[in-house]
Regions:
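N-terminal active-site segment of His-dependent metallophosphoesterases
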Residues: 1-83
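Phenylalanine-focused residue identity feature
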Residues: 8, 30, 52, 92, ...
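Generic marker of "main functional regions" within proteins
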Residues: 21, 42-45, 58-61, 75, ...
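Short, structurally constrained coil/turn elements
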Residues: 23, 84-86, 117, 133-134
Length: 140
């Protein structure tokens, strides 16, 4: 099994407002990228458990969740992001692998997008999505 890289950032901003739910306006983001359809444990158990442990307010899937070369990677990515959507809102944006699939296999790409949407994932295409968490407004 490939290793997962964990990186933690603490970002402070005066733009954040105190909220009812969290001390000091804490907002926890969980970001995934470049999984290329790989699984980390059965049904991506390692990623799902890591996300649950972090208790994120928002999950960002920053592209390259699938592999242009492996069609079976589509189902892996849809299953993972749909499962994570049960934990917190998930926003997805294309990476270069998704763009290649869109260009060369448009039907496959559309099926992938539909799978994400059915799984409760917010798919972003050059747009902004806004949500509110415990009084804290967030624009992605």
């Amino acid at each position: 099994m490939k290793k997962i890289k964990h990186t933690f950032y603490d970002i402070n901003t005066e733009k954040a407002q105190n909220t009812e739910r969290k001390a000091e306006s804490e907002l926890v983001l969980f970001c995934l990228s470049d999984l290329h359809g790989n699984e980390y444990g059965k049904q991506n158990r390692v990623i799902v458990e890591t996300a649950w442990d972090q208790k994120p307010d928002l999950i960002l899937a920053a592209g390259d969740m699938l592999s242009g070369e492996k069609e079976e990677s589509d189902a892996v990515a849809v299953a993972l992001l749909s499962r994570l959507a049960d934990l917190a809102p998930v926003c997805f944006t294309d990476g270069n692998h998704e763009m290649q699939v869109k260009k060369f296999f448009p039907e496959r790409y559309e099926a992938f997008m539909e799978g994400l949407k059915k799984g409760g994932v917010q798919v972003l295409h050059n747009e902004t999505w806004c949500t509110e968490d415990g009084g804290q407004k967030v624009a992605v």
